[in-house]
Structure formats: C-alpha cells, structure tokens
C-alpha cells in the first residue's frame, strides 16, 4: 500500500467511530488537530513493551469523553500480547500492512492479511501475533476507551512489567493465557 493510500485510509477509518458517537457528544471548543504520519498525538513516543514496536496514539480518550481510543502499532515485529480479555470494551483490529496476523477470538482462529479487520467483543478472550518477515502496521480502536490509554502509557515505560496480572486487572483486563508466540 503506498503512503498516500495509507494516509487516506487512516483518515477515513478514524472518522468512523466519531460518526457513531456524534449523537451522544457535546461539541468541543478545542481546535481540530491533525496527527501526522509516524507521530503520536501526545508528542512523545510510546513502545509496545513485548515487541518494542512503535505505538502512535492517534485519538486520545479525553478527546471523545472516554468513548474511543485509537492507536497505530507500526514497525511491528514477530510476536504479540498474552491471551487476555477486556471486561469493559470492544477492540477492533485493522491490519494495514505487512505479512500476516494470526488471531484467536474465543475459539475462532483467524488469519488477517493487509486490509482485513475484525472485532473482538468485550468479555471474549483473544490473542494475536504478527508473523510477517517485514515490519507490519495495525490500527487498534477501543470503545468505550475506559482505562486502556493509561495501560499503554504505563506499559510503554522502559521498566514496565508487561505480563503483570495486577496491571491488567487495574485497567479492566485479565491475562487468561500465554502469547501465541514467544
């Protein structure tokens, strides 16, 4: 996917959750902000603690009254998180580029190729792993956002213990199994 198509796609995808929330939201007095490609909305970088890939926060929880949090995981390398469950939110995955992502949502086994997306419902255990040889890129949308943004803030710190069950519990999730790949 070329850079122009990717950027257009990201802009279109990020508009979808707002259309859903529009009827419920109060108009903001804040100016509209554009988040450039390969940048983070907060202005400082985040890392996926297990794989050290980039996590770019694109839409912050506070911008949508806790309804939506959107993060782009770019420069993905082989691996992924432990099997876990979210008590409070759905998680939508949109695989943008790279090799493949293998997933399990509940008992269903899934393979995502670039352009594919899937929704993991709340309270359904899920796990994923990137298996491409070239760096990959995937967009995650969480709704409602709950405490997920602070989870990513905390786990992107250099000394963070990613597999800490207490950290997951404190953010409305539970580890229920190992990662698909070590």
Q: Which positions does each model-derived feature cover?
A:
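N-terminal secretory signal peptides and thylakoid transit peptides that target proteins
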Residues: 1-17
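Acidic/histidine-enriched, glycine/proline-rich intrinsically disordered or flexible terminal extensions
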Residues: 149, 153-182
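C-terminal segment of N-terminal export signals and the immediately downstream linker at the start
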Residues: 21-55, 157
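Ligand-binding loop in jelly-roll beta-barrel domains
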Residues: 122-149
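A short glycine-rich, His/Asp/Glu-containing loop-to-beta-strand
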Residues: 47-83, 89-90
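Short acidic-glycine-tyrosine-enriched beta hairpin
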Residues: 107-122
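Glycine- and acidic-residue-biased ligand/ion/polar-headgroup-sensing regions
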Residues: 90-101
